[in-house]
Regions:
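Conserved structural position within tetratricopeptide repeats
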Residues: 35-38, 68-72, 103-106
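Register position in tetratricopeptide repeats
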Residues: 22, 56, 90, 120-123
Length: 123
């Protein structure tokens, strides 16, 4: 029975990674994610999960490392752009924040929160 449960977890590695993060086991999640990275280096979901984890851990460099890779795959991914916007906002890198806002609005013109950020920065 234990073997079957463990096999189930590892046959869905992204699900296992999310579970580790959800349970707050970040050290194990980083280790597990690093082991998966070669196989999932072009997997949008995996990269976003890793980037989100580093955002939770307040590591802007690693967050951007993964989120920029997501955006290489899908340039107008609103969730990835939003996360990138937040990191650059925290770093006070307003030119990049403006760029992210404009891309988000081009995909979702009803995003009033992003419009407000853009209006505030562009004055």
């Amino acid at each position: 029975m234990v073997v079957k449960i463990l096999t189930g977890l590892f046959s869905y590695p992204k699900r296992n990674l999310r579970k580790l993060i959800r349970n707050g086991d970040f050290k194990e999640a980083i280790k597990f994610g690093n082991n998966l990275e070669e196989k999932y280096s072009q997997d949008h979901d995996f990269l976003f999960i890793m980037g989100s984890m580093f955002y939770i851990l307040e590591d802007p460099k690693m967050t951007l490392h993964y989120i920029d890779r997501v955006l290489e795959i899908s340039e107008y991914d609103v969730d990835a752009l939003s996360l990138k916007l937040r990191v650059h906002q925290h770093l006070k890198e307003n030119d990049t924040v403006i760029e992210c806002c404009k891309k988000i609005i081009s995909v979702n013109s009803d995003n009033y929160e992003v419009k407000d950020i853009l209006n505030e920065l562009e004055g």
